[in-house]
Every structure is written in C-alpha cells, then in structure tokens.
C-alpha cells in the first residue's frame, strides 16, 4: 500500500510540474504575440503620420514654386 501511495504522489507531482511548464510556455508565447501586435500598431501609426504629411509637403512645394 505504501508503494501505491508513493507512486500516486510521484504521478501527481510530475503532472503538476508538466502543467506548470506548459502554462509558462503559453504565457511567454502570448506575451511575444502581444508585443508583436503592439509593434505592428506603432508601425501603422507612424505610416499614417507620414501619409498625413504628404498633402502638407505638396502644398509647401507648390507655394515655393509660385514664389520662385
């Protein structure tokens, strides 16, 4: 009976360790995914800012060409 208790304890312990490792890997992959999404959002906002400046640059160039 003592052998069965030790075996059961070992199985439960190894299962918990395995579960803990899997949860940690899942958490790390979710963090990486969130960081990647945040980087993508920042890149898109930078692109939008640059695209918004194009009409301003065109009007500045046309104003300079009218002066010269």
Curated annotation (Swiss-Prot):
GO terms for cellular component: extracellular region. Residues 23-49 form a propeptide. Residues 1-22 form the signal peptide. InterPro entries: Frog_antimicrobial_propeptide. The keyword ATP-binding does not apply. It is found in: Secreted. The primary structure of this peptide is identical to that of Medusin-L1 (AC P0DQK9) and of Medusin-AS (AC A0A5Q0MU22). Belongs to the frog skin active peptide (FSAP) family. Medusin subfamily. This is Medusin-C1. It comes from Agalychnis callidryas. The lineage of its organism: Eukaryota, Metazoa, Chordata, Craniata, Vertebrata.
